Swiss-Prot record:
Residues 45-58 have a biased composition (Basic residues). The gene is smu-2. InterPro entries: Red-like (IPR039896), RED_C (IPR012492), RED_N (IPR012916). Intrinsically disordered protein. This is Smu-2 suppressor of mec-8 and unc-52 protein. Residues 34-44, 87-106, 330-423 have a biased composition (Basic and acidic residues). Residues 66-94, 371-427 form a coiled coil. It is found in: Nucleus. Disruption phenotype: RNAi-mediated knockdown gives rise to no visible phenotype in wild-type, but suppresses the effects of unc-52 mutations. Residues 185-196, 307-317 have a biased composition (Low complexity). Probable component of the spliceosome. Heterotetramer with smu-1. The smu-1 homodimer interacts (via the N-terminal region including the LisH and CTLH domains) with smu-2, giving rise to a heterotetramer. One of its GO terms (cellular component) is spliceosomal complex.
């Protein structure tokens, strides 16, 4: 396949593009062979259509026009191809030239930032950028046009250093010349005039060189004071206002020289030191004198005590005795006094302890008596309060019984009134058979129900309970003598209505009764507390605390 002539290369393609188009097209390998007789590649069936009469043919003119037309078409194709290739770069040609012309670094930087490549290309671009930065450090320049940080531009730094050294050399030369001129002028005239000195000083002060002017100012103009008066002791101080805000700046205060305290001289300081030494010596002597006096008094006492013993031993000094060196025994009063004082102190302590114990016992008795009295008083108050509560309960029970009796009497009167109204004869009762008998039997007084003994049931609030009696025996006797009869016959067998309305009414009634019962209990408790406060003499609506 490598020997196949149809496989073209890039070089062949470039030759085809750059070479001019020939008059006849190139013969393709896939084209049909031409007819050997006629020399035409068209088939015989189409020849008669393309043949023209010989009288209409102009061989020279036709050939010239055909060549011109093909030439214009080739030029147009070349122009179009060049226009297309103008937008492309021949990188292979540039590589063959080995990159003689370097590209713009700004474009390379922009391309490096805009188009991300692979890791190797990115590393190459970073190395190129570092190399460009290192090269730019040595490009030089001046202070006005440098684009780097001061000190990194090495060539600019060397340039500035050389300029500074050159200026220093010029200053040294100017100083030397000025010194030589001064020496020569002094040697020429031993006593120069004031005008010449003034002119020379003015020339030095107005010199164009900055170094000369600064040296002249330092050497001849500045007179540094030996002692600054402002820094004298107590002359300058800071004034700080503590009452103001913290951010206030302290002000300085300059005192006058007359307001300053005078400094002490060396003689006054020495005199003061001498006075201090004298005073310390005198005080130390006074501090030591009481000890000396005590020692002298002790010696005097010992001498007076030893005098009688020495006089008694004088007559017997002739005889030899083993007790000659011993003194007579003199009892010491000091030990006896201390012993008596100790006894008196111990006796005083014992009496004080006894009195303290007696006071403690008395306080305990008083405290016990106080607590007993308070307990008895509280017990009596509790009994009185209970008695008052029982009296109030009895009175309430009596009032309740009286109200029940009155209510029963009213009911009896109403029943009697109704019976009398029914017993009144209208005059036609005898006409009805059995009318009087039925009427009389229905309203027989013996058959009337006694509702006072009717069993009210568990839901009825009982009028009498345990707390209405003082003792348990009275309540038990009341319960034994109580009669509980069944309810009236008309209360049995009553059919309830359809639906749950009756139940709702009954529940509402039971809730109302329960609330009334609780309210009555609360009122009773409040009445008891109020009565207890009134009986105790407090007069307040509060519960009495228990001890």
């Amino acid at each position: 396949m490598a020997d196949n002539p149809t496989n073209l290369r890039n070089a062949d393609f470039r030759k085809l593009l750059t070479s001019a188009r020939s008059d006849r097209p190139a013969v393709s390998a896939f084209a049909k062979p031409a007819d050997p007789k006629t020399g035409d590649d068209k088939p015989a069936s189409f020849k008669h259509k393309h043949l023209k009469p010989a009288k209409f043919k102009k061989p020279q003119a036709a050939a010239h026009g055909k060549a011109k037309k093909e030439k214009t078409e080739a030029d147009e194709d070349e122009a179009a191809l060049k226009n297309i290739l103008k937008n492309y770069r021949d990188r292979a040609a540039e590589r063959r030239k080995q990159g003689d012309e370097k590209e713009d670094p700004s474009k390379l930087t922009a391309a490096y930032r805009a188009v991300p490549g692979d890791a190797r290309s990115a590393q190459d671009q970073a190395d190129l950028r570092k190399q460009a930065i290192l090269e730019s450090k040595y490009l030089g320049g001046d202070l006005e046009h440098t684009h780097l940080v001061k000190g990194l531009d090495y060539s600019l730094l060397n340039k500035v250093r050389s300029e500074i050294d050159k200026s220093d050399d010029d200053d040294d030369d100017d100083i030397d010349t000025a010194f030589d001129e001064k020496v020569t002028s002094s040697s020429s005239s031993s006593k120069p005039s004031e005008a010449s000195l003034l002119a020379q000083e003015l020339a030095q002060s107005h010199s164009e060189n900055r170094m000369v002017r600064s040296l002249h100012r330092v050497l001849f103009k500045n007179e540094v004071p030996l002692h600054n008066q402002l820094f004298a002791k107590g002359r300058m101080a800071y004034v700080v206002e503590l009452e103001d805000e913290e951010t206030d700046i302290p002000t300085t205060l300059l005192r006058s020289l007359h307001d300053l305290p005078r400094a002490e001289s060396a003689q006054s300081i020495q005199a003061n030191n001498l006075i201090i030494l004298k005073l310390s010596h005198v005080l130390s002597h006074l501090r030591a004198e009481p000890k000396k006096k005590k020692k002298e008094e002790f010696r005097v006492q010992l001498g007076s005590r030893d005098a009688p013993g020495a006089a008694a031993a004088a007559p017997g000094a002739k005889g030899d005795s083993i007790y000659d060196d011993l003194d007579d025994y003199v009892p010491s009063r000091k030990s006896r006094d201390s012993r008596d004082a100790g006894r008196r102190g111990s006796r005083r302590d014992r009496s004080r302890d006894r009195s303290r114990d007696r006071d403690r016992d008395r306080d305990r008795d008083n405290r016990d008596r106080y607590f007993e009295k308070s307990a008895n008083s509280r017990r009596e108050e509790e009994q009185n309060r209970r008695e008052q509560q029982r009296e109030r309960e009895r009175a309430e029970q009596e009032r309740r019984r009286e109200r029940e009796k009155e209510r029963e009497q009213e009911k009896a009167k109403e029943r009697e009134k109704k019976r009398k109204e029914l017993e009144e004869s209208s005059g036609y009762d005898e006409c009805y058979p059995g009318g009087l008998v039925e009427m009389g039997g229905a309203w027989d007084s013996d058959e009337e129900a006694d509702y006072s003994k009717m069993d009210a049931g568990p839901k009825k609030n009982q009028a009498v309970n345990r707390w209405d009696f003082d003792t348990e025996e009275e309540y038990a006797s009341y319960m034994e003598g109580r009669e509980a009869l069944p309810k009236a016959a008309y209360q049995y067998g009553v059919k309830n209505g359809e639906g749950g309305r009756k139940n709702k009414k009954q529940s509402a009634v039971s809730d109302a009764k329960r609330l009334d019962r609780e309210l009555n209990e609360i009122n009773k408790i409040m009445d008891k507390r109020k009565a207890g406060g009134d009986g105790a003499g407090g007069g307040g609506d509060y519960k009495k605390p228990k001890y």
